[in-house]
Amino acid sequence: DGQAVHQSSDGWVPVYTDDSQCLGVMSVGFLLRSKNDSVVWRGPKKQGMIRQFLSDVRWGDLDYLIIDTPPGTSDEHISLMEAIHPYAPQAVLVTTPQAVALSDNLRSLDFTRKVGLPVIGLIENMSGYVCPHCAECTNVWGRGGGASLAEQQGLAFLGRVPIDPTLVRLLDDA
């Protein structure tokens, strides 16, 4: 909150998570006048922004560039693949344990296969709720859907990430 993207002679400077500048973040949200503004763009405008984020942001020397996309196989995904294909990208699929999310991930996996995007593996996010008082993990939305999907599809299962209120609070305060 309160972070802004700055323009330099080399391009946009991403927002950094701390003074070490080890983790730079870029979001359309940083470019809006108000955090309550909506983004109502059609394909060409979205495609242009994707290209701008990849070419006009001063990323510096990167070990990794993590691109978080919504589930699905929209124009944005196709545009993104066209733009990053020369860099030999790889994907990590992220799901939640519910059946509807697993179904979305099957479509995403089908997309990666059709466009030749190698998948490193799958992560199950929101895999249980960690009680802030006793640290017990309750599986609110079930458990094991991600591991099961990974096994069925021949993917590496990279692990589970529970909902942790302490982490949520820390991120909100950052």
Where are these regions (language model features)?
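Phosphate-binding loop that captures ATP/GTP phosphates
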Residues: D1-L32, Q47
